[in-house]
């Protein structure tokens, strides 16, 4: 599997943004005699402390599995909130069924068990996108709920810019709650 996040993390620790002597240049951008990754740096930031701790590259699969698992936990918390605030008749068995369908019936299980550069980025970004939804998706939103949601989506954008539309959710809810008549 392609792994650019370990080399990016190593470069970050050296104060660089480019990848020094990449083993393969597939998907990289060549600019000014240097190689750069076209996607966000967010996943590499999680490799830095692990590399410092272990003194070596970390298998990307471990990061992917961790973030995929954490994403399922946050999705479970969203489902509990949906049950308590919107659908009180929703049974516990229904909640677990929806969670199982999310975890194993979507591409989440596939993407979350692979460790290539694309999958690591998607799982890290997914977690922060799901966190953003968790902070803002509630029946009685308060002004203080918007900041952690917007920050979570902002962090997610550092991983994959493809969630840019999802990042508009806090703004939509703010307009719905405070601007619209």
List where the protein language model places each region:
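Short hydrophobic/aromatic helix or loop-helix immediately within or flanking a transmembrane segment
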Residues: 27-55, 123
């Amino acid at each position: 599997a392609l792994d650019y996040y370990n080399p990016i993390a190593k470069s970050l620790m050296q104060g660089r943004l480019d990848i020094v002597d990449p083993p393969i240049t597939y998907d990289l951008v060549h600019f000014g005699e240097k190689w750069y990754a076209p996607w966000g740096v967010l996943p590499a930031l999680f490799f830095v402390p692990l590399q410092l701790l272990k003194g070596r590259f970390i298998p990307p699969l471990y990061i992917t599995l961790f973030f995929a698992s954490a994403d399922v936990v946050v999705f479970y918390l969203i489902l509990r909130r949906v049950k308590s605030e919107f659908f009180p008749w929703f049974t516990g068995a229904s909640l677990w069924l929806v969670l199982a369908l999310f975890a194993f019936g979507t591409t989440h299980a596939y993407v979350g068990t692979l460790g290539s550069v694309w999958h690591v980025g998607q799982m890290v970004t997914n977690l922060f996108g799901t966190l953003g939804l968790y902070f803002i998706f509630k029946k009685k939103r308060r002004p203080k709920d918007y900041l952690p949601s917007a920050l979570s989506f902002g962090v997610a954008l550092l991983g994959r810019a493809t969630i840019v539309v999802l990042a508009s959710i806090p703004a939509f809810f703010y307009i719905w709650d405070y601007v619209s008549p």
